[in-house]
């Protein structure tokens, strides 16, 4: 019996099939640098600071705090809602009030844990009196939303409600007619 280490065996095998591959037992970095958890966290923190630094914003002036996100930033499912309500403004996380309870039930019904997805909103500050964000407010925050999506880089993007739909496809559509229709959205050159 002749004992050979794995490197010799692999080299012999690759030579036998005329491969140009060179064996190496060095670990393979499977994630791109921009996908490393530390880099993603840093990008999210920088984005959060940019949003917090917005000046001359009525939403910010009437809200208690910025509501940025909740959930697993490594998730391949990203959910985008309208904007924070009173409960979200108090807690600092999206989908914490009645809409959050409904979302939790819907996710449980399809055996998905809330903690396993990533959640954000179109606007990050509560509109006064829980009103719907205006088109101008949606437009103001859209660049931050698109950057947020680009950082998370989900495989599935779920938009919840008319405001989220407007942020992606404009206000010439009615949600009642678009509900249930799959659409491709291009953000920063990538199709979602």
Residues covered by each model-derived region:
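A polyanion-binding, active-site-adjacent surface
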Residues: 3, 8-192
């Amino acid at each position: 019996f002749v004992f050979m280490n794995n490197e010799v065996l692999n080299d012999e095998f690759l030579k036998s099939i005329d491969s140009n591959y060179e064996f190496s037992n060095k670990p393979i970095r499977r994630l791109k640098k921009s996908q490393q958890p530390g880099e993603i966290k840093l990008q999210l923190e920088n984005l959060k600071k940019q949003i917090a630094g917005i000046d001359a914003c009525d939403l910010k002036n009437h809200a208690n705090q910025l509501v940025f996100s909740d959930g697993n930033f490594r998730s391949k499912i990203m959910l985008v809602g309208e904007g924070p309500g009173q409960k979200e403004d108090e807690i600092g996380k999206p989908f914490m009030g009645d809409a959050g309870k409904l979302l939790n039930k819907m996710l449980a019904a399809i055996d998905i844990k809330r903690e396993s997805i990533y959640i954000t909103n179109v606007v990050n500050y509560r509109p006064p009196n829980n009103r719907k964000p205006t088109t101008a407010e949606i437009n103001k925050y859209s660049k931050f939303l698109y950057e947020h999506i680009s950082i998370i880089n989900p495989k599935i993007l779920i938009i919840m409600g008319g405001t989220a739909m407007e942020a992606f496809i404009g206000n010439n559509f009615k949600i009642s007619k678009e509900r249930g229709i799959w659409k491709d959205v291009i953000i920063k050159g990538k199709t979602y």
